């Protein structure tokens, strides 16, 4: 166990410092969205409060940068360093604490798992750049950590801070608040493996009934979370939309395919912990095959085919920018008509995988909350972004069975290989646009 922890920490520290120094050496100037974020932060540091309408997220990251500027300055490297410290030090510590609280255990396996989740490739990559996602993720997880520690006030304050990084975090605040109240009540909440659809509905009704009977008891937590929710409503009334700045390219829509893309994302980055063990079990393989070839599956595939046909959205941002990996997924793969319609059959298998592993330890209420929050986070977004999947991925992993130490090490190795490759591609596989002959373009998540 000591050797495993040593390998994880040495590799983590080595790649963290290598990435920081290499990106600052080869990419010293702001790149892609950093052009807007760094310029805005540096304006704030000069006490110039003019807002760039191209920026559609709140100014939380810039305000933190202004607060820290007397100590670290406001240069490009100083601003990037803020995210690096949070991503490399803050997130592993915070995830370790959350996993310990949820599983009521400490030790090497929890540490392995914390670094495994922190090494999730898109999350790890953006720790080196000045983007809002690292701060957003940190404050949402901090709010959840406080809720698990029964501190509703601290949790609600963290939720408030998270809204200054990304507006859609209001959905996660609702999840966190309900989780807090549920952990302090006794109500009908059967294990998912033993629950029917009617039981899930009864769980929701039972929770609401007990909650309403305990309003006086929960008055302080209700006021804490309620104040944050009211501040969000006030922002909506003032701004007229959830989006700041230019709203034309960020209109809400119904994008059901997002859930399918998330499933692929989830299993691609976690297959050493779940799919390998799943496939090695004869009983689970048999159960999966019988489910896939059932009459119910025919109906599910039919719905998935309709979603693929009518709800595969080719967002202009993705098709116009060949610097992102998703450009090649949509512009090359999804343009192949038969491949688009082959996808629903893979989604069906992933749906059954997902449901089966969720039944291993999840309660009905937790499953309902996670499903609802994931849908509300992803489905309204017409733009597909790997960064949108980060919080759903982490919260689902928190509530699934803790992998073994060996499985964590395999998943960590997968992540770090991908991180090394994507860092190399970002730094050295550059190309030039004819329209900008003096600027190097780079591939990234």
Swiss-Prot record:
EC number(s) from the headed UniProt entry: 2.4.1.256
InterPro entries: Alg10
Transmembrane region(s): 7-27, 54-74, 81-101, 123-143, 170-190, 192-212, 218-238, 256-276, 298-318, 336-356, 364-384, 408-428
UniProt keyword list: Endoplasmic reticulum, Glycoprotein, Glycosyltransferase, Membrane, Transferase, Transmembrane, Transmembrane helix
Catalytic activity, reaction form: an alpha-D-Glc-(1->3)-alpha-D-Glc-(1->3)-alpha-D-Man-(1->2)-alpha-D-Man-(1->2)-alpha-D-Man-(1->3)-[alpha-D-Man-(1->2)-alpha-D-Man-(1->3)-[alpha-D-Man-(1->2)-alpha-D-Man-(1->6)]-alpha-D-Man-(1->6)]-beta-D-Man-(1->4)-beta-D-GlcNAc-(1->4)-alpha-D-GlcNAc-diphospho-di-trans,poly-cis-dolichol + a di-trans,poly-cis-dolichyl beta-D-glucosyl phosphate = a alpha-D-Glc-(1->2)-alpha-D-Glc-(1->3)-alpha-D-Glc-(1->3)-alpha-D-Man-(1->2)-alpha-D-Man-(1->2)-alpha-D-Man-(1->3)-[alpha-D-Man-(1->2)-alpha-D-Man-(1->3)-[alpha-D-Man-(1->2)-alpha-D-Man-(1->6)]-alpha-D-Man-(1->6)]-beta-D-Man-(1->4)-beta-D-GlcNAc-(1->4)-alpha-D-GlcNAc-diphospho-di-trans,poly-cis-dolichol + a di-trans,poly-cis-dolichyl phosphate + H(+)
Record localization: Endoplasmic reticulum membrane
UniProt keyword Membrane present: yes
Lineage: superkingdom: Eukaryota
Pathways per UniProt: Protein modification; protein glycosylation
Top-level EC class: transferase
Membrane topology: Multi-pass membrane protein
Pfam families: DIE2_ALG10
MF annotations from Gene Ontology: dolichyl pyrophosphate Glc2Man9GlcNAc2 alpha-1,2-glucosyltransferase activity
Glycosylation sites recorded in the entry for this protein: 76, 239
GO cellular component: endoplasmic reticulum; lumenal side of endoplasmic reticulum membrane
Chief localisation class: endoplasmic reticulum
UniProt record similarity statement: Belongs to the ALG10 glucosyltransferase family.
Function: Dol-P-Glc:Glc(2)Man(9)GlcNAc(2)-PP-Dol alpha-1,2-glucosyltransferase that operates in the biosynthetic pathway of dolichol-linked oligosaccharides, the glycan precursors employed in protein asparagine (N)-glycosylation. The assembly of dolichol-linked oligosaccharides begins on the cytosolic side of the endoplasmic reticulum membrane and finishes in its lumen. The sequential addition of sugars to dolichol pyrophosphate produces dolichol-linked oligosaccharides containing fourteen sugars, including two GlcNAcs, nine mannoses and three glucoses.
PANTHER family reported in the protein's UniProt record: ALPHA-1,2-GLUCOSYLTRANSFERASE ALG10, DOL-P-GLC:GLC(2)MAN(9)GLCNAC(2)-PP-DOL ALPHA-1,2-GLUCOSYLTRANSFERASE-RELATED
Protein name: Dol-P-Glc:Glc(2)Man(9)GlcNAc(2)-PP-Dol alpha-1,2-glucosyltransferase
Source organism of the structure: Schizosaccharomyces pombe (strain 972 / ATCC 24843) (Fission yeast)
Gene: alg10
């Amino acid at each position: 166990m000591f050797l495993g922890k040593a390998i994880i920490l040495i590799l983590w520290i080595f790649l963290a410092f290598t990435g920081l120094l290499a990106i600052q050496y080869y990419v010293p100037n702001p790149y892609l969205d950093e052009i807007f974020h760094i310029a805005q932060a540096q304006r704030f540091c000069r006490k110039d409060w003019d807002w760039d309408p191209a920026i559609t997220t709140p100014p939380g990251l810039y305000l933190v940068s202004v607060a820290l500027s007397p100590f670290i300055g406001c240069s490009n490297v100083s601003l990037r360093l803020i995210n690096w410290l949070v991503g490399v030090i803050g997130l592993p510590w915070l995830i370790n604490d959350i996993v310990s609280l949820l599983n009521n255990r400490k030790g090497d396996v929890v540490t392995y798992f914390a670094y495994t989740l922190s090494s999730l490739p898109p999350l790890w990559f953006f720790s080196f750049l000045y983007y809002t996602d690292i701060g957003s993720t940190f404050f949402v997880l901090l709010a959840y950590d406080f809720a698990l520690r029964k501190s509703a006030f601290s949790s609600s304050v963290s939720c408030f801070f998270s809204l200054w990084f990304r507006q859609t975090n209001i959905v996660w605040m609702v999840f966190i608040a309900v989780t807090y109240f549920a952990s302090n009540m006794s109500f009908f909440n059967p294990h998912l493996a033993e629950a029917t659809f009617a039981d899930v509905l009864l769980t929701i009704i039972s929770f609401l009934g007990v909650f309403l009977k305990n309003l006086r008891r929960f008055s302080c937590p209700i006021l804490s979370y309620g104040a944050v929710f009211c501040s969000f409503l006030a922002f909506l009334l003032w701004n007229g939309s959830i989006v700041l700045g230019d709203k034309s390219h960020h209109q809400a829509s119904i994008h059901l395919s997002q859930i399918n893309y998330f499933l692929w994302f989830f299993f691609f980055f976690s297959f050493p912990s779940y799919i390998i063990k799943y496939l090695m079990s004869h009983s689970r393989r048999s159960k999966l095959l019988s489910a896939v070839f059932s009459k119910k599956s025919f109906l599910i595939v039919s719905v998935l085919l309709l979603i693929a046909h009518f709800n595969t959205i080719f967002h202009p941002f993705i098709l116009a920018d060949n610097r992102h990996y998703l450009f090649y997924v949509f512009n090359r793969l999804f343009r192949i008509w038969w491949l688009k319609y082959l996808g629903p059959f893979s989604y069906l298998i992933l749906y059954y995988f997902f449901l089966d592993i969720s039944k291993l330890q999840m309660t009905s209420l937790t499953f309902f909350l996670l499903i609802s929050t994931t849908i509300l986070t992803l489905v309204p977004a017409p733009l597909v972004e790997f960064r949108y999947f980060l919080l759903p991925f982490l919260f689902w992993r928190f509530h699934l069975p803790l992998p073994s130490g060996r499985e964590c090490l395999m998943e960590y190795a997968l992540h770090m290989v991908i991180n090394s490759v994507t860092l190399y591609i970002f730094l050295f596989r550059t190309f030039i646009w004819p329209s900008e002959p003096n600027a190097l373009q780079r591939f990234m998540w």
